[in-house]
Amino acid sequence: MTLAVVTGASRGIGLAVADELRAAGFHVVRLARSLTDGSADRQTDLRCDVSDPTQVERAVTRVRGELGVPDVVVNNAGTFFIKRLEETSPKDFSELIAANLTGPFLVARAFVPAMVERGSGHLVTIGSISDHVAFSGSTAYAASKFGMRGMHEVIRTETAKSGVRTTLVSPGPVDTDIWDAVDPDSKPGFTKRKDMLRAEDVAEAVVWAVTRPPKVDVTEIRLVPTVYAPRG
């Protein structure tokens, strides 16, 4: 059995990644705070807020105890808002950092050492174009994504030649429900939803990366809508 763990897998990119991995033959463990514990054919759902160390420990204990060390871990869970610096409260900032940066740290810390010990595995980090391009209104989000990029690169260095592969996937805007509150179609300067990437575009890139032969390490993938390419 080839085992994959996907965080934030109840909707959007995470759900699409989980579905594509399952279609590719993986047994997929979906983690999300909105899920209910359960199982189906080649799928296990665990309710887990990845920013909570206790919940992560519970989920990891179940995964490793019942299914083993995963072959693939996709760190995808996160949140998003657009607020200028002066509009972003300390609470806004800390909550977003907890979801987007602390959560991936906890998940990677829980699984990567066991992969290294086994001598194989693949960590996929879902970043963003905001991990290398600055946008007005993204003080907190950019801090989390630049931080995630930095953490991912350090993990890559620390796992070099261990048999564990790492891939950072940095997409431009993806048409998911995180944009509902923003309503980009009504605002100048925003990519219109019809022109955005689909969650499935990102998912297909993830599956492609993790199904390359062991000697091939896909270190980074950047995906942007064609209308967006000059800034990507």
Residue ranges and their predicted role:
Residues S10-R11:
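Conserved glycine-rich cofactor-binding loop
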Residues A24-S39:
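Conserved glycine-rich Rossmann-like NAD(P)H-binding loop of the short-chain dehydrogenase/reductase
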Residues C48-R58, P90:
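The beta1-alpha1 cofactor-binding region of Rossmann-like NAD(H)/NADP(H)-dependent oxidoreductases
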Residues R84-L85, D92-I97:
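Substrate-binding pocket helix/loop in short-chain dehydrogenase/reductase
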Residues A108, S144:
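Active-site helix of classical SDR
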Residues S128:
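Residue(s) in the substrate-gating loop at a strand-loop-helix junction
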Residues S162, L168-V169, G189-R231:
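C-terminal helical subdomain
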